[in-house]
């Protein structure tokens, strides 16, 4: 029997709740398809601050490195906001990405037919949306040096540096074009080349990569226009390629096309090593412990893990289809209750319904 080692990082807020549901579902799926998943839960984010004093302990890093994949729920809580930046949960996430060289963030956004009414946009605008945001994840302004805050005679001055090298742009562009080749063969590169030198390099390198993919249509949009187009005509996009900061913002805009950020999975990948699979949403501490969180983004992240990291494509498709069936049956968590339905369920009940479908 094939066996896989998965590191679980439940993190903070609703993280443990959606992790518990996903763990149980993956156990069912693995048994049904004849493989084994060995899970190891490790502290990360706020939970690691509580246990180890830092958001990303070395023991967690080593466990991640020795895994076939990492399944992360969510991190962050306002109670850690007064800590020095290097000790906050968010810094642990940045360190995870850099330590595993997770340079490629893949965020699919696809409208589930039964949820078209959940979107804040009209049905006709969103019903054909099927796009992927490919975001560079380990460079750009979040990692650039110098950065900091200094005292001046005019008060405090704060600064960050946005930087990219040709190699960094090249490798993320390759990911986007290869992905587009499997889809509708369109890449839209998003930058701010009319203002930023770093974006001019981004555009030049993307064009160079595109020369190797003659069958792929490459277009360019400035980030402000891309944000508008995502709301105005989202179905025009296939693969959106962009940098760290712009991708962070655009992927959250794209997330709301589905009606809830609780629906969207993501994968953060490297060329050689374990990937990290996580929902796009945050830790939602305001609803933690109430059993009302939407576990679907976490479950779809698990499906991405099955497909990409473990090559268990049949199992991944089976899980995705079961999730769609539950939604088609009218079951909704509270974040989706703008749709007319009487079948509101909580996090654990959504997991139980899905488990019944999988048997």
Curated annotation (Swiss-Prot):
Residues reported to bind NAD(+): 282-294
Cofactor remark: Binds 1 Mg(2+) or Mn(2+) ion per subunit.
Marked site: Important for catalysis: 142, 192
Residues the entry annotates as binding substrate: 97, 107, 135, 224
Single Gene Ontology MF annotation: 3-isopropylmalate dehydrogenase activity
Subunit (UniProt): Homodimer.
The family this protein is said to belong to: Belongs to the isocitrate and isopropylmalate dehydrogenases family. LeuB type 1 subfamily.
Name of this chain's protein: 3-isopropylmalate dehydrogenase
Organism encoding this protein: Prochlorococcus marinus (strain NATL2A)
Gene name per UniProt: leuB
């Amino acid at each position: 029997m094939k066996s896989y080692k998965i590191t679980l990082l439940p993190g903070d807020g609703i993280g443990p709740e959606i992790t518990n549901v996903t763990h149980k579902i993956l156990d069912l799926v693995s048994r049904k398809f004849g493989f084994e998943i060995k899970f190891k839960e490790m502290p990360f984010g706020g939970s690691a601050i509580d246990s180890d004093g830092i958001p990303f302990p070395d023991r967690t890093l080593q466990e991640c490195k020795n895994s076939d994949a990492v399944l992360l729920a969510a991190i962050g809580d306002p109670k850690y906001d007064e800590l020095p930046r290097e000790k906050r949960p968010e810094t642990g996430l940045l360190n995870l990405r850099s330590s595993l060289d997770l340079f490629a963030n893949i965020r699919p956004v696809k409208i589930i037919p039964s949820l078209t009414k959940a979107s804040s946009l009209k049905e006709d605008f969103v019903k054909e949306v099927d796009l992927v945001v490919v975001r560079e994840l380990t460079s750009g302004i979040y990692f650039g040096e110098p950065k900091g805050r200094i005292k001046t005679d005019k008060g405090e001055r704060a600064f960050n540096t946005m930087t990219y090298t040709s190699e960094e742009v090249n490798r993320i562009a390759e990911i986007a074009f290869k992905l587009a080749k499997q889809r509708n063969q369109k890449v839209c590169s998003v930058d701010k080349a009319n203002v930023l030198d770093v974006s001019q390099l981004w555009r030049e390198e993307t064009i160079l990569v595109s020369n190797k993919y003659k069958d792929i249509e490459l277009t360019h949009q400035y980030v402000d226009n891309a944000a508008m187009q995502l709301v105005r005509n989202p179905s025009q996009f296939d693969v959106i390629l962009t940098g760290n900061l712009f991708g962070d913002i655009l992927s959250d805009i794209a997330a709301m096309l589905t009606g809830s950020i609780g629906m969207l999975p993501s994968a953060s990948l490297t060329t050689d090593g374990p990937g990290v699979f996580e929902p796009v949403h945050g830790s939602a501490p305001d609803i933690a412990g109430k059993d009302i969180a939407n576990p679907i983004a976490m479950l779809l992240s698990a499906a991405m893990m099955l497909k990409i990291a473990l090559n268990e494509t049949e199992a991944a498709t089976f899980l995705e289809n079961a999730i769609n069936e539950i939604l088609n049956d009218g079951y909704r968590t509270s974040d989706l209750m703008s749709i007319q339905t009487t079948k509101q369920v909580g996090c654990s009940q959504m997991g139980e319904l899905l488990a019944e479908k999988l048997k």
